[in-house]
Amino acid sequence: MFEAVTNCEVSIEFVKEENTTIYLNVIPKLIIDVVYAYGNMPTENQMISGDNYLVKEQNNGHMLFAISDGMGKGYSAFYESDMTLHLVEDIIKLNIDPSTALTILNTFYVVQDYLERYATLDFLDINRHNGNATFYKMGANTTYIFKQNKMVDKIINQSLPLGIDEEVDQSSYQLEDGDMIIMSSDGVVENLIDNDLLEEFISNAKDLAPQQIVYEILNYTIKNQIKTKDDMTVIVLKISTRKKK
């Protein structure tokens, strides 16, 4: 009954009994684990990257990952993307769900569009209780999900950066054991002539640790380009399911 209501596995803990009333705690179980790593590299001739990233593990069993790419390069781009992620984090701290938080943030950017400053946002919310992943994309790069069976699923951006579209692009995806998620800023793929070769390269590196995969992706991009045209940020996540006891 409890699992039907909560849509996830639960454990029941006895708290106390008073007269004819029994008090129980219903605790959702975590069914997936997430191992992750991230890396960032500025464009040529820049001391600082215009990309920023956010990784946050919440007490409610959710994990949040985000990449923001500020308009332009250098400190101005860094400031814009850094402010974007700080605003996201501040709104979520108010116990507002990510979907509402990002709608509020997007509205804020719509209102202040006269500033002519924009940032992309690639946001991922993973529910570790039921394995559901929700992707929010606002001008963001494609996210790749590498499967155990060698297939690759893609979450493709359908909207413009924050403050330009009134709607927030949102997609749900059910994660499975062995999935590997690659989030990146557009500097990674824009530098390459053939993105299919990058997919093949990542697929062959799938058995490596997440941090090593981050390094390999950045190094591959550098070696297979003429010039670093944009900042590059990569987040690699590996999903594993817990065995039922």
Please annotate each region the language model reported.
Residues 28-52, 106-110, 139-172, 218-219:
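PP2C/PPM family metal-dependent serine/threonine protein phosphatase catalytic domain
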